[in-house]
Structure formats: C-alpha cells, structure tokens
Amino acid sequence: MAVTMFRAALRGWRTDVQRGCGLRLLSQTQGPPDYPSFVESVDEYQFVERLLPATRIPDPPKHEHYPTPSGWQPPRDPPPNLPYFVRRSRMHNVPVYKDITHGNRQMTVIRKVEGDIWALQKDVEDFLSPLLGKTPVTQVNEVTGTLRIKGYFDQELKAWLLEKGF
C-alpha cells in the first residue's frame, strides 16, 4: 500500500513534463540544416579512373609468330568441329591444372568443358593409353564441366588441346 501511494505521488510530481517531447517535436519545429554547397568537377575524374580496376581482362596483343616466347598460343580461329569445346580461362590460358590432395593423390583437372564431356573423356583416354600402357582412371563431372585424370599429365594434355585447336 505504501508503494502504491509513493508511485501516485511521483506521478503527480512529474505533471509539468510533456510526454513525447523528444526529437520528433524538435525536428518539426526546426527547418532542414544548411549544408555547404559543392561543385562537381569532371576534369579530375581521369585520376579516379586510374585507380579503378579494369572490368575485364583485355584481349591479348597480336604477335608476328606463335607460340610467343612465354609459350602462349591463341586458339584456332575457326574452332575445331568436335562435339565438345574447352573454353579458355579468363587469362586466355588452356584450363588444365594439377591438383594434389591428401598429401599424395595427384590429379590433372581439365575445366571449362562445354558440350559432350563424355566424348572428351574417350579422346583423353585414347591419347593417354599409349603413354601409360593402360587406360587412365578418369572422373567426369557434367554439372561443373570438369574432367579429372589420375596422375600428372598437365603438360601433355595442354599440348594435345593446343594441337586440337582449343
């Protein structure tokens, strides 16, 4: 009972305070703040453009003879008439990579395969069988367009794909 009377006394004591007189009431009485004006200058934008990264990798320059000293070679102009196509990476290289997992499992990966990936698997097996003396172990992933071959054959497969015109 004493607590209730104390609360009532406190409520009566704060009667002169208006409820809700916070930021909302103050913002309605004042105008918008005065911001300093600005000047838009396009003359200096060339310095900003130098800092922005390029949106795409530029096309490689034309050379007198191929392969270049670095070993790069462009794809054949009419693409080869095969049921599959191996697209170049964004740096214009043949997408054949070495992969090692679990410390000693060596794999070669061909990425960016479009079309009939099973025909590519058969051609790769026909190409590598004389080198190995047996049929290589391969794994096809149709969803990601990758072909994995057990062992390191990246240099041989890159040369073979370049010879085919990819």
Swiss-Prot record:
Keywords carried by this UniProt record: Mitochondrion, Ribonucleoprotein, Ribosomal protein
Pfam families: Img2
One biological process term in Gene Ontology: translation
Record's GO cellular component terms: mitochondrial large ribosomal subunit; mitochondrial ribosome
Record has Calcium as a keyword: no
Record Gene3D superfamilies: SUI1-like domain
Location of the protein in the cell: Mitochondrion
Keyword rRNA processing set for record: no
Broad class of the protein's primary localization: mitochondrion
Superkingdom per UniProt: Eukaryota
Chain coiled-coil ranges: none
Region span, Disordered: 56-78
GO molecular function: structural constituent of ribosome
InterPro entries hit by this protein: Ribosomal_mL49 (IPR007740)
Similarity remark: Belongs to the mitochondrion-specific ribosomal protein mL49 family.
Quaternary data: Interacts with OXA1L.
PANTHER family associated with the record: LARGE RIBOSOMAL SUBUNIT PROTEIN ML49 (PTHR13477:SF0), MITOCHONDRIAL 39S RIBOSOMAL PROTEIN L49 (PTHR13477)
The protein's name in its UniProt record: Large ribosomal subunit protein mL49
